[in-house]
Amino acid sequence: MDSRLQEIRERQKLRRQLLAQQLGAESADSIGAVLNSKDEQREIAETRETCRASYDTSAPNSKRKCLDEGETDEDKVEEYKDELEMQQEEENLPYEEEIYKDSSTFLKGTQSLNPHNDYCQHFVDTGHRPQNFIRDVGLADRFEEYPKLRELIRLKDELIAKSNTPPMYLQADIEAFDIRELTPKFDVILLEPPLEEYYRETGITANEKCWTWDDIMKLEIDEIAAPRSFIFLWCGSGEGLDLGRVCLRKWGYRRCEDICWIKTNKNNPGKTKTLDPKAVFQRTKEHCLMGIKGTVKRSTDGDFIHANVDIDLIITEEPEIGNIEKPVEIFHIIEHFCLGRRRLHLFGRDSTIRPGWLTVGPTLTNSNYNAETYASYFSAPNSYLTGCTEEIERLRPKSPPPKSKSDRGGGAPRGGGRGGTSAGRGRERNRSNFRGERGGFRGGRGGTHRGGFTPR
């Protein structure tokens, strides 16, 4: 808590220093002397109104400056002529164009000691992107204030580490390699193709073959996907948003989520160094489309998926120019969500080899994949699932139970006749002498049933 408070104070101090620099104040403590108070603004407005009234010849005499004692009309006319001449001389002065120096004119809330955070203008002035100021984006501190979620993530990571298969990898040219040789069928497929868009933005020559979307569509992903499975496709931030959806439909998937990678530039603030010639804005994000195949419901298929554990945003520092690697957090999102152990990563690299995954890519430097050995990890019934503990099941977010027709009214049948102890409109009262809203027995005064006798 103390470190968090210290961080807030340091940011506040930095904002006051920037504001003092923009307003021309000597220090952050002298900002109040530079800013005008409400009374001073009112005096300035009254002075301006008085000057306008004195220059306006059509204004009534009551709004003009009163004549001093002994002043004649001729003196007044001469004085007014002098004022008009001075005004005309000022208008004839050459026009001086104002040069933009800082954003003090555009700051919001400058009449207070704590101006509002205008992150867009701050980006124009300093080059710091607005997403730089989002707190608790790392995996370590994201759930610091949510102890149940933090415990859930810890337990799931331990279970995943125990159930992971040894890492396997295969160096292969995916364009020439028949991916149907990969067995068995996979529960999760992650595609990270080296799109032309990545190198077009950086302006650096690619050290591997760039893939077009026509090439990606030719992959027979549907032949290696399990009947119920998920796919994650990195598609950039341009034309891939539309063409990636076309690929999912061709392979038999339905798009269900769009995971967005937001890139910060805390370590290297400034404008984007390289711009895509086909882009309209500076692109600071990438998209990963998620598709679902088969019938998977989060309310009934808790043995295969755990929904709502992670969010659909990844916020990390932008990699160096020419580095097209994706954040490692995408693996955590996939492993936390899908409990299937048969995971395939296409277009992987040496840096992405990971326990529990089969990595295939042309840039890998070695191979250890054996189809029989890999298939033996899933030979037992339901061995393709990681399983779940009672504690994880208790902590994980769940869908609300479905409402049946019998639960619609609270337990009692609708109608129930117009008499008897079950009468009423489906509202069950937790009382032994419940009388329905309509019908039922009514006795006189007294007795256990307000009549003193047992009803017929």
From Swiss-Prot:
Annotated protein name in UniProt: N(6)-adenosine-methyltransferase non-catalytic subunit METTL14
Similarity-based family: Belongs to the MT-A70-like family.
Lineage: Eukaryota, Metazoa, Chordata, Craniata, Vertebrata
Positively charged region required for RNA-binding: region residues: 245-254, 297-298
Site residues, Interaction with METTL3: 146, 242, 245, 298, 399
Phenotype of gene-disrupted mutants: Conditional knockout mice lacking Mettl3 and Mettl14 in germ cells show impaired spermatogenesis, leading to male infertility. Conditional knockout mice lacking Mettl14 in the developing nervous system die by postnatal day 25 due to protracted cell-cycle progression of cortical neural progenitor cells and reduced differentiation of radial glial cells during embryonic cortical neurogenesis.
Tissue-wise expression: Expressed in testis. Highly expressed in radial glial cells during embryonic cortical neurogenesis.
The keyword RNA-binding is annotated on this UniProt entry: yes
Organism: Mus musculus (Mouse)
PROSITE patterns named in the record: MT_A70, SAM_MTA70L_2
Gene that produces this protein: Mettl14
Modified residues (Phosphoserine): 399
InterPro entries reported in the protein's UniProt record: METTL14-like (IPR045123), MT-A70-like (IPR007757), SAM-dependent_MTases_sf (IPR029063)
UniProt subunit comment: Heterodimer; heterodimerizes with METTL3 to form an antiparallel heterodimer that constitutes an active methyltransferase. Component of the WMM complex, a N6-methyltransferase complex composed of a catalytic subcomplex, named MAC, and of an associated subcomplex, named MACOM. The MAC subcomplex is composed of METTL3 and METTL14. The MACOM subcomplex is composed of WTAP, ZC3H13, CBLL1/HAKAI, VIRMA, and, in some cases of RBM15 (RBM15 or RBM15B).
Domain of life according to the entry: Eukaryota
